[in-house]
Amino acid sequence: MPIAQIHILEGRNDEQKETLIREVSEAISRSLDAPLTSVRVIITEMAKGHFGIGGELASKVRR
């Protein structure tokens, strides 16, 4: 059972996350020749104040 864990900054809507899950699942299924029903995708959303980019908080870099 392939499992993909993806960390993203908060702010995406459910439709965007659903698209991400579907497309990642399809890519994993295709590339590993695994049944689509066996693929798991975990999305972890991070607050922009809990992530750094180039030494600064993402909340300051990305608005």
UniProtKB/Swiss-Prot annotation:
Matches recorded under SUPFAM superfamilies: Tautomerase/MIF (SSF55331)
Biological process according to GO: toluene catabolic process; xylene catabolic process
Annotated active site: 2
InterPro entries xrefs: 4-OT (IPR018191), 4-OT-like_dom (IPR004370), Tautomerase/MIF_sf (IPR014347)
Pathway given in the UniProt record: Xenobiotic degradation; toluene degradation; Xenobiotic degradation; xylene degradation
Entry function: Catalyzes the ketonization of 2-hydroxymuconate stereoselectively to yield 2-oxo-3-hexenedioate.
The family this protein is said to belong to: Belongs to the 4-oxalocrotonate tautomerase family.
Protein name: 2-hydroxymuconate tautomerase
